[in-house]
Amino acid sequence: MKVLVVGNGGREHAIAWKVAQSPLVKELYVAKGNAGIWEIAKRVDISPTDVEKLAEFAKNEGVDFTIVGPEAPLVEGIVDEFEKRGLKIFGPNKEAAKLEGSKAFAKTFMKKYGIPTARYEVFTDFEKAKEYVEKVGAPIVVKADGLAAGKGAVVCETVEKAIETLDRFLNKKIFGKSSERVVIEEFLEGEEASYIVMINGDRYVPLPTSQDHKRLLDEDKGPNTGGMGAYSPTPVINEEVEKRIREEIVERVIKGLKEEGIYYRGFLYAGLMITKEGPKVLEFNVRLGDPEAQPILMRVKNDFLETLLNFYEGKDVHIKEDERYALDVVLASRGYPEKPETGKIIHGLDYLKSMEDVVVFHAGTKKEGNFTVTSGGRVLNVCAYGKTLKEAKERAYEAIRYVCFEGMHYRKDIGDKAFKYLSE
């Protein structure tokens, strides 16, 4: 069958890598992809957000199944465009994608259906927002309402920083329409984790658990990013916590969507804070996480394409997990997340291909002649398997020694938060 993967990042490389392993695939396309994906899939030169053009391409080429990686095309209504033409596509429609497309919508939804989350207020007026922040104090979290590539949530340790962030969002509109409205919410203490499920109507199937590292620098310092690394599974989500996540969050979301008359088919990612009171939702995303998808898909033992197709058709599926840990370290460009430098030649990629239990997923890369060069903020995901998390971590960081590009930056502490829970 012909399969199309939509997106350009590390998550999409992981999806394409996993799908390419299926004997069901006759032809694999990617729009637009990156230097890594182009080694295993045909490049389609259409932007992921040009949803009508993509739907036309899929119709004309006879694409049998499409998997959407990033949030922007989903919020733009790619699923609606494909379904209008009778095409099979895995992802939520435009209405359902509001769970990620609007923080205010998501918070209102959570409040209405009793889904545990931080207390919050929504503002469009700078003066009113400033007044509120001065009244409640810091630490506090300021979030742009719309999509901001993972950079729209700012943890403000001081009132001054909160006001400065509000000014950048509401007055300077650094994210355009996405920051015309802000959500201000209480700062939650605890341990972050990611819980991702596949939903089709009222059925859902959990994927392996994971933990992301959102801040740019070690020890969770520096600005928020799209994610600097992840590992799976995470001991932060034990059996008892998982039971609560399923009952208090996932099942209430499904019930709420049903009551709102919204049909949801696709991935749902709950970004969680595991607090003393239990799991609370920081955000919903309507797609796989990036970088979480990379270690998660490395640990899925199923023929992933077959599993998705069966689930899409409403059949029962079960995810078989690899016993090993998988850990992903993101290599980023100098200047990320504000103004990443690009066009730097990447050295050492061929050597990494020969390393056992190491997988490299490309993100911001492209081809220039015979060279692979950087083309974005997050450049590569160097991932490794290990019988223990410690082994996976050592193997990934060992592999990083062989790859370099000018201005390369990465965190040295991916996975460290787990060690206090593990007796390795």
From Swiss-Prot:
Cofactor(s) listed: Mg(2+); Mn(2+)
Swiss-Prot/TrEMBL keywords: ATP-binding, Ligase, Magnesium, Manganese, Metal-binding, Nucleotide-binding, Purine biosynthesis
Keyword Metal-binding: yes
A biological process from GO: 'de novo' IMP biosynthetic process
Keyword Ligase set for record: yes
Top class in the EC scheme: ligase
Chain residues that bind Mg(2+): E283, N285
InterPro entries: ATP-grasp (IPR011761), ATP_grasp_subdomain_1 (IPR013815), PreATP-grasp_dom_sf (IPR016185), PRibGlycinamid_synth_ATP-grasp (IPR020561), PRibGlycinamide_synth (IPR000115), PRibGlycinamide_synth_C-dom (IPR020560), PRibGlycinamide_synth_C_sf (IPR037123), PRibGlycinamide_synth_CS (IPR020559)
Binding-site list for ATP: 133-194
Catalytic activity, EC: 6.3.4.13
GO molecular-function terms, A-Z: ATP binding; metal ion binding; phosphoribosylamine-glycine ligase activity
Regions annotated as coiled coil: none
Pfam families, per the entry: GARS_A, GARS_C, GARS_N
Biochemical pathway: Purine metabolism; IMP biosynthesis via de novo pathway; N(1)-(5-phospho-D-ribosyl)glycinamide from 5-phospho-alpha-D-ribose 1-diphosphate: step 2/2
Catalysed transformations (reactions): 5-phospho-beta-D-ribosylamine + glycine + ATP = N(1)-(5-phospho-beta-D-ribosyl)glycinamide + ADP + phosphate + H(+)
Cysteine disulfide partners in this protein: none
Cofactor binding note from Swiss-Prot or TrEMBL: Binds 1 Mg(2+) or Mn(2+) ion per subunit.
Sequence similarity: Belongs to the GARS family.
PANTHER family named among the record's database cross-references: PHOSPHORIBOSYLAMINE--GLYCINE LIGASE, PHOSPHORIBOSYLAMINE--GLYCINE LIGASE, CHLOROPLASTIC
Protein name stated in the entry: Phosphoribosylamine--glycine ligase
Species per Swiss-Prot/TrEMBL record: Aquifex aeolicus (strain VF5)
Biological classification of the source: Bacteria, Pseudomonadati, Aquificota, Aquificia, Aquificales
